[in-house]
Amino acid sequence: MASNSSSCPTPGGGHLNGYPVPPYAFFFPPMLGGLSPPGALTSLQHQLPVSGYSTPSPATIETQSSSSEEIVPSPPSPPPLPRIYKPCFVCQDKSSGYHYGVSACEGCKGFFRRSIQKNMVYTCHRDKNCIINKVTRNRCQYCRLQKCFDVGMSKESVRNDRNKKKKEAPKPECSESYTLTPEVGELIEKVRKAHQETFPALCQLGKYTTNNSSEQRVSLDIDLWDKFSELSTKCIIKTVEFAKQLPGFTTLTIADQITLLKAACLDILILRICTRYTPEQDTMTFSDGLTLNRTQMHNAGFGPLTDLVFAFANQLLPLEMDDAETGLLSAICLICGDRQDLEQPDKVDMLQEPLLEALKVYVRKRRPSRPHMFPKMLMKITDLRSISAKGAERVITLKMEIPGSMPPLIQEMLENSEGLDTLSGQSGGGTRDGGGLAPPPGSCSPSLSPSSHRSSPATQSP
C-alpha cells in the first residue's frame, strides 16, 4: 500500500531502516512502489520480481545492505493547486489574500489600514448608500469604509498588526551607503526652494468651494472652464519660473528650453495638482484655494481624463512625497534627454544625472528601511507621460467644446514642437500679455521663452 506522499521524508543519500537509498531529484518526496503488507513479505522473498525489482523483507534489508538492486521510485505527486481566493469582499476586484479578517484586494486592504491608523473621518455627498465596486470604489471613501466594516474587516486586526511591527527588530539597512555630500545637499535645497516659491503647499491655502455642477457630470461647465483655464495659464507661467531656477537649465539653447518645457509642462501640471489631492473629500485644490470635487473637475474640462488623474493622485499617497521629492521629480521630468528635436540631448542628460543622484540619495536617506521607494517614484514618470498623452488628446476635443478660442498660452504650450514655425509665423500670434512679437528665424514664440518677463511674482498657479 502506497503511503501518503505529503508525510514522507524526502530521500537523500543515506539509509532508510538500514537499506541504502539513492538520492532523487524530485521536488516532492517520491513514493516507493511495490511495498507489500508486512505479513506477505516472507512468502514473496523468493519469487521473481513482478515489476523488475524485488521487494526485500526487513530481514533481507539487514543482510543485503551491499546489494546492487535498485529501488525504483513511483512518479512524484502532482504539485498542489494554487490557492484561489474569493473576490475582494469590498469591491469584487481580484483578491490578494485574507486581510483583516476577509478576502480583500491590495487596494481595499491599504485603504482600510490607512483609514484606521490615521482615524480618517469621511463624508458621503449622496445618500450614504453608494455602490462600491472595482470602478467606483475611489469615488466615495465614506461608503467604501462602511462596506469594509459591513463585510467584516476588523479594526483590532489593524491595531494588532501595527503593534506587531513596532515590536519587530528593525531590518538591517541597505548595505549600499548613500552620503549626502555638500554639493548634493545644495542641489536639493535649490530645487526645493524653486518648487516652494512657484507652488504653495496645500496647508498654506485658504480653501473655498463652489456649487457649480457639483452633483452631475456634464460635457462642459463654461463657468468652471473659464476659471480652470485662467488658473492653468498661471500655472504654466509658474512652471516656466520653476524651470529657470533649476541649475543649468538656462545654459541650454533657447530652442531646447522651449522643447523641454512644451514636452514636460503637462506632466508637471498633473503631478502638482495631484499633490493637492484630499482623499477624505475626493477633491483637488488650486493655488487660489478653489477646491473642486471629482464631478466638478470633469465638468471644468478634464472630461474623460478625470478618473485617470484621480487614480494617479491616489497612487501618490503611499509615497508620502515632500516638497524636495516633488520638486526633484518635476525637474527630472523636465530635464530629460530623450525628448524629440533637442539640439543638445547629451547636455540635457548631463544636467539630469545629478538630479537623479540627488533624488536617490535623498529618498534613501529619508527612508533607510525602504530602498524600493526610489524606483517606485521614478516609475511615476512613466505614468505621468501616459496621462499627458491622453491630456494632449483632450485639448484637441476641448477646442470643439468651448465657445471661444483656447487660451493662447495653453494652446502654445501643448502644441507639438514641430508646430513652432507655424505658430511663430502667424500674424497677431502674440499672447494676452506678450504682444505680437515676431521671433527671429529658428527661435520660438516669445510667450514661451524662459527669458520672457511675462510672469509676475504675485501670480499664482493651480
UniProtKB/Swiss-Prot annotation:
Q: Name one GO biological process term.
A: spermatogenesis
Query: Which part of the chain holds the cross-link Glycyl lysine isopeptide (Lys-Gly) (interchain with G-Cter in SUMO)?
Result: K166, K171, K399
The subcellular location is: Nucleus; Cytoplasm
Q: Where does all-trans-retinoate bind?
A: C235, S287
InterPro entries assigned:
NHR-like_dom_sf, NR_DBD_RAR, NR_LBD_RAR, Nucl_hrmn_rcpt_lig-bd, Nuclear_hrmn_rcpt, Retinoic_acid_rcpt, Znf_hrmn_rcpt, Znf_NHR/GATA
- Motif UBR5-degron located where? 254-258
- Using the UniProt annotation, give all residue ranges assigned to the region (Modulating): 1-87
Residues annotated with Phosphoserine modification? S77, S96, S219, S369
Keyword field: Cytoplasm, DNA-binding, Isopeptide bond, Metal-binding, Methylation, Nucleus, Phosphoprotein, Receptor, Transcription, Transcription regulation, Ubl conjugation, Zinc, Zinc-finger
Q: Where is the NR LBD domain?
A: 183-417
Gene inactivation phenotype reads: Seminiferous tubules of 6 month-old animals display varying degrees of testicular degeneration, with moderate to severe levels of germ-cell degeneration. Epithelial cells in the epididymis show general disorganization. Sperm count is reduced to about 1.7% of wild-type and sperm mobility reduced by half. Rara and Rarg, but not Rara and Rarb, double knockout mice exhibit growth retardation after 3 weeks. Defects are found in the growth plates with deficiency in cartilage. Growth retardation was noticable in limb sketal elements such as femurs.
**What Pfam families is this protein classified in?**
Hormone_recep, zf-C4
- Keyword Transferase: yes or no? no
Its GO CC terms are:
actin cytoskeleton; chromatin; cytoplasm; cytosol; dendrite; neuronal cell body; nucleolus; nucleoplasm
Q: Where is this region: Hinge?
A: 154-182
**Modification N6,N6,N6-trimethyllysine occurs at:** K347
Q: Which residues form the signal peptide?
A: none
Record PTM text: Phosphorylated on serine and threonine residues. Phosphorylation does not change during cell cycle. Phosphorylation on Ser-77 is crucial for the N-terminal AF1 transcriptional activity. Under stress conditions, MAPK8 enhances phosphorylation on Thr-181, Ser-445 and Ser-461 leading to RARA ubiquitination and degradation. Phosphorylation by AKT1 inhibits the transactivation activity. On retinoic acid stimulation, phosphorylation on Ser-369 by RPS6KA5 promotes interaction with GTF2H3 and the CDK7-mediated phosphorylation of Ser-77. Ubiquitinated by UBR5, leading to its degradation: UBR5 specifically recognizes and binds ligand-bound RARA when it is not associated with coactivators (NCOAs). In presence of NCOAs, the UBR5-degron is not accessible, preventing its ubiquitination and degradation.
Locate the compositionally biased regions of type Low complexity. Answer: 444-462
The induction field says:
By retinoic acid.
What family classification does the UniProt entry report for this protein? Belongs to the nuclear hormone receptor family. NR1 subfamily.
Task of the protein: Receptor for retinoic acid. Retinoic acid receptors bind as heterodimers to their target response elements in response to their ligands, all-trans or 9-cis retinoic acid, and regulate gene expression in various biological processes. The RXR/RAR heterodimers bind to the retinoic acid response elements (RARE) composed of tandem 5'-AGGTCA-3' sites known as DR1-DR5. In the absence of ligand, the RXR-RAR heterodimers associate with a multiprotein complex containing transcription corepressors that induce histone deacetylation, chromatin condensation and transcriptional suppression.
Q: What is this protein called?
A: Retinoic acid receptor alpha
User: What is the originating organism of this protein?
Assistant: Mus musculus (Mouse)
